[in-house]
Amino acid sequence: MKADLPSRRILNTVLPGILVVMWSTGFIGAKFGLPYAEPATFLAYRFTVVAVILVVVAFLMRAPWPKSAKAYFHLFIVGLLLQAVNLGCVFFAIDFGVDASVTALINGLQPALVAIIAISVLGERTSGWQWLGFVLGLGGVAMVVWRKLELGVGTPLGMSLSVCALLGLSIGVIYQKKFCEDMDLRTGTAMQTAAAAVAMWIVSAGWETGVVDWTGEFIFAFVWLSVVLSLGAIILLLYLIRCGQAARVSSLFFLVPPVAAIFSYFMFNETFGAVAMIGMLVAVIGVGLVNRNP
């Protein structure tokens, strides 16, 4: 047992970083697969597969299900915000030409925005450092967005969708903390994903052709996003929470945008000029300040 302790410590040190890298690939996978399927159709298939797997896992593990209609309602709202609105807007933004790294950067403001929203909604206290971090994060993102639009990379609509994705994610996190804090992660996530799947099928049926080109590239992106990322990241996150590593994961999530930018550079040749790089650095520092321990 004692011999296993150093290995466990090393594992618990490395795994949060692995989770951050996995999370970063979500934006890359979206851009990789979108040439072969429309955004809502892509997500409809993805959410359906993930929801079915999660429901099966929940039944096999005999996980407790919500006991009231109100509990289901709250789970559905969170699913729509965290998955349908957030990921839906991310996918549509990338489809409108926004760099994957830029969508990751804007989404990366979530801890800062949640900290500010939590003041009025949850009554949580926010320090001066967190306010400074929020201002720096917002300013850094504004620099990147302005520079990218000036260079003709992306469109105002695409950038607006990225902001909508951030709002959906941030409001969803607050809503879940207020109304779904006691949910079972297995059944709760299954219901949230099912709600997002229904929403995406409605969008797909109403505004898209529903055609998917099942190429090798698309299948790889689909399997990666649906199984490796959606399920693997959830399992890894649950393990880290059980091991008491949730705080470390939260403190490292501000690294998602630069990691996504590195992936984007090598896979799609997405580049950052001097102004955009400074903006990303300022934004990352800002989110890091929001996450710092008081």
Where are the model-predicted features located?
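Structural signature of hydrophobic alpha-helical transmembrane segments
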Residues: 38-50, 94-110, 155-167, 217-227
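Hydrophobic residues within membrane-embedded alpha-helical segments of Major Facilitator Superfamily
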Residues: 22, 29, 49, 81-82, ...
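Hydrophobic residues within alpha-helical transmembrane segments
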Residues: 14, 18, 44-49, 77, ...
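Helix-helix packing/entry segments at the starts of transmembrane helices
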Residues: 43-45, 102-109, 175-198, 230-266
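Membrane-interface interhelical linkers
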Residues: 1-18, 51-78, 91-96, 120-132, ...
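Hydrophobic/small/kink-forming positions within alpha-helical transmembrane segments
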Residues: 24, 28, 55, 79-84, ...
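Juxtamembrane helix-loop-helix junctions in multi-pass membrane proteins
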Residues: 21-52, 171-196, 209, 214-216
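Hydrophobic transmembrane alpha-helices of multi-pass small-molecule transport proteins
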Residues: 54, 117, 126-148, 166, ...
